[in-house]
Regions:
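Lipid interaction determinants
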Residues: 9, 18-120
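Bacterial N-terminal signal peptides that target proteins for export
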Residues: 1-8
């Protein structure tokens, strides 16, 4: 299995893992996960080693939360501002910078996630 970072399929995100029991988020730290919507909108997701998560939406909105690895999932909770769902978990996906994968956002909409080098 190639070394990956944890990228959650939420928009609010998507994540990569060396193994489900031990999420290796290192490739997500310092990089950006971009969720692309079919209508051209996007969400940029940022994970920090200390459990902080932030996102920026194409319409200017920003969201903050805490992330945690739980088995084969990455979960977000403690959203600020509050969201429709108080907690959202997404399966882990193995990926490297430049990789893309399909997922669904918390409302069930199709998205294409991409792990992009650097913070954008």
């Amino acid at each position: 299995m190639k070394q990956g970072a944890v990228i959650c399929g939420l928009a609010i995100v998507g994540v990569l893992a060396a193994s489900p029991a031990s999420a290796d988020m290192s490739k997500a730290f310092g990089n950006t996960i971009v969720s692309h919507y079919p209508n051209g909108q996007w969400v940029r997701h940022y994970f920090d080693p200390d459990g902080r998560y932030t996102s920026q939406f194409s319409d200017g909105r920003r969201v903050a939360a805490r992330w945690s690895a739980e088995g084969d999932k990455i979960c977000l909770s403690g959203f600020s501002p509050r969201q429709i769902l108080p907690r959202f978990c997404s399966r882990m996906v193995e990926a490297d910078v430049g990789d893309t994968w399909r997922a669904r956002d918390p409302l069930g909409r199709n998205i294409r996630n991409e792990l992009v080098a650097g913070r954008r």
